[in-house]
């Protein structure tokens, strides 16, 4: 009888006790007392256990707060120049997370959050600074575009969607999200249209500033789990923004004129006016920004008060842009050299080529952000051809390639025709 039972069992199609898949649908089926489990379910169990362990470790591990000098040292690896801005950010971020991690009861002193406002022209490194800070601290990070935000109830993105995006960056871990960093770009674009309050509704300007106030200062935001608009039947996640660091950035075009008027730059006399403009560059003027200047620009007083740390980034000159091309860990020339190296080709740039790239970026007023598009345009053809040129060993990018769209010099191990002849004979 026992033998017959075994034979009957062998003839049966066995199935996984967890997912129900048959032994024919999976790679392995492991038998236990009265149960079976397939390789797919084992893999899923391993993933669940690993995720739980990681989450517990994240909760138990106290955030290590780097010293300001350590933060700046890492910023130096990715951001060229902007020394004062990097020092200011390093101190502000260190103090912010020290405030969060402090377990000492401070009944007599309340440490307030210090959000940051970055002023500077396009391509000066505002976004890169914020991204690098988040990487140093290993905290969730998200970027929001202020021009897409509108007041609640109007077409556009609600300000709460910023927190939804941060929550997604934290893999929906609310505790991690509540220690994250939010960078709001183009903040100058939500300035109200005039210095005086208007009776008409400004849903994408002053209205957005008002909506951002509580979020930046610290509030418990009710956010929909999957983003989008709120509706009454929906369940909400509660996220406390008290310990989220908000960094706002913008070019603030025209703010220099406001500062210059306050400082008496437009003094009487034609000659005095010209002299003041020569002496005071945009960078120099932005260094002297005061809250009253931002008020005249169109930011509301309450919003300015939520961003106590204001730092200006410098305009990037030719030397700075050349250094950006060469020095950082993620320098563009290093990236392109690595791409060519994967095809067995050495890529070289002449000094004239680097100067031409930097000057073209200055001419376009694109700053460091414009460097990649200039390089891509100049090198498109050679990047298209090199993978097909098996004998190519070296590519030289000269000034003429950038300015006159000339062909780069390509050196071969042997003439291409000679390399192709043996193939013809063998054929």
Curated annotation (Swiss-Prot):
Gene3D superfamilies xrefs: 1.10.8.60, ClpX chaperone, C4-type zinc finger domain, P-loop containing nucleotide triphosphate hydrolases
InterPro entries (UniProt xref): AAA+_ATPase (IPR003593), ATP-dep_Clp_protease_ClpX (IPR050052), ATPase_AAA_core (IPR003959), Clp_ATPase_C (IPR019489), Clp_protease_ATP-bd_su_ClpX (IPR004487), ClpX_bact (IPR046425), P-loop_NTPase (IPR027417), Znf_CppX_C4 (IPR010603)
Domain ClpX-type ZB: 3-57
Entry annotated with the keyword Chaperone: yes
PANTHER family: ATP-DEPENDENT CLP PROTEASE ATP-BINDING SUBUNIT CLPX-LIKE, MITOCHONDRIAL, ATP-DEPENDENT CLP PROTEASE ATP-BINDING SUBUNIT CLPX-LIKE, MITOCHONDRIAL-RELATED
Binding of ATP, residues: 121-128
One GO MF term attached to the UniProt entry: ATP-dependent protein folding chaperone
Entry keywords, A to Z: ATP-binding, Chaperone, Metal-binding, Nucleotide-binding, Zinc
One GO CC annotation: HslUV protease complex
Record-linked NCBIfam families: clpX, PRK05342.1
SUPFAM superfamilies, alphabetized: Glucocorticoid receptor-like (DNA-binding domain), P-loop containing nucleoside triphosphate hydrolases
Signal peptide, first to last residue: none
Family: Belongs to the ClpX chaperone family.
Subunit details: Component of the ClpX-ClpP complex. Forms a hexameric ring that, in the presence of ATP, binds to fourteen ClpP subunits assembled into a disk-like structure with a central cavity, resembling the structure of eukaryotic proteasomes.
Residues at which Zn(2+) binds: 16, 19, 38, 41
Role played: ATP-dependent specificity component of the Clp protease. It directs the protease to specific substrates. Can perform chaperone functions in the absence of ClpP.
Domain of life, source organism: Bacteria
Protein name: ATP-dependent Clp protease ATP-binding subunit ClpX
GO BP annotations listed: cell division; proteolysis involved in protein catabolic process
Source organism (scientific name): Myxococcus xanthus
Coiled-coil ranges from the UniProt annotation: none
């Amino acid at each position: 009888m026992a033998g017959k039972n075994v034979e009957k069992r062998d003839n049966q199609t066995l199935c996984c006790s967890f997912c129900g898949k048959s032994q024919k649908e999976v790679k392995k089926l492991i038998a236990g007392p009265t149960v079976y489990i397939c390789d797919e379910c084992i893999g899923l169990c391993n993933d669940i256990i690993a995720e739980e362990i990681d989450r517990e470790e994240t909760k138990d591990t106290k955030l290590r707060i780097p010293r300001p000098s350590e933060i700046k040292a890492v910023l130096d690896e990715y951001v060229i120049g902007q020394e004062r801005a990097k020092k200011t950010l390093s101190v502000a971020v260190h103090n912010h997370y020290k405030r969060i991690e402090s377990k000492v009861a401070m009944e007599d002193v309340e440490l307030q959050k210090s959000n940051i406002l970055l002023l500077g022209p396009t391509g000066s490194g505002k976004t890169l600074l914020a991204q690098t800070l988040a990487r140093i601290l290993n905290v969730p990070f998200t970027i929001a575009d202020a021009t897409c935000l509108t007041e609640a109830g109007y077409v556009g993105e609600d300000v709460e969607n910023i927190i939804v995006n941060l929550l997604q960056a934290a893999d929906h871990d609310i505790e991690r999200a509540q220690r994250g960093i939010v960078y709001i770009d183009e903040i100058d674009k939500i300035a109200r249209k005039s210095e005086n309050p208007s009776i008409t509704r400004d849903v994408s300007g002053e209205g957005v500033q008002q909506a951002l106030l509580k979020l930046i200062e610290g509030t418990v935001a009710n956010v929909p789990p999957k983003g989008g608009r709120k509706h009454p039947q929906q369940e909400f996640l509660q996220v406390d923004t008290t310990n989220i660091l908000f960094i706002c950035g913008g070019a603030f075009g025209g703010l220099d004129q406001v500062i210059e008027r306050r400082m008496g730059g437009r003094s009487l006399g034609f000659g005095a006016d010209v002299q003041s403009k020569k002496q005071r560059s945009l960078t120099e003027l932005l260094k002297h920004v005061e809250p009253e200047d931002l008020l005249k620009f169109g930011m509301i007083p309450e919003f300015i008060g939520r961003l106590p740390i204001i730092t200006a980034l410098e305009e990037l000159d030719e030397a700075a842009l050349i250094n950006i091309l060469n020095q950082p860990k993620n320098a563009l020339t290093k990236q392109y050299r690595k791409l060519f190296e994967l095809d067995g080709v050495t890529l070289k740039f002449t000094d004239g080529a680097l100067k031409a790239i930097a000057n073209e970026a200055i001419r376009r007023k694109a700053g460091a952000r414009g460097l990649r598009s200039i390089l891509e345009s100049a090198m498109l053809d050679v990047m298209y051809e090199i993978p097909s040129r098996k004998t190519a060993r070296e590519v030289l990018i000269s000034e003429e390639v950038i300015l006159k769209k000339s062909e780069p010099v390509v050196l071969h191990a042997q003439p291409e025709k000679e390399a192709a002849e043996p193939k013809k004979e063998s054929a």
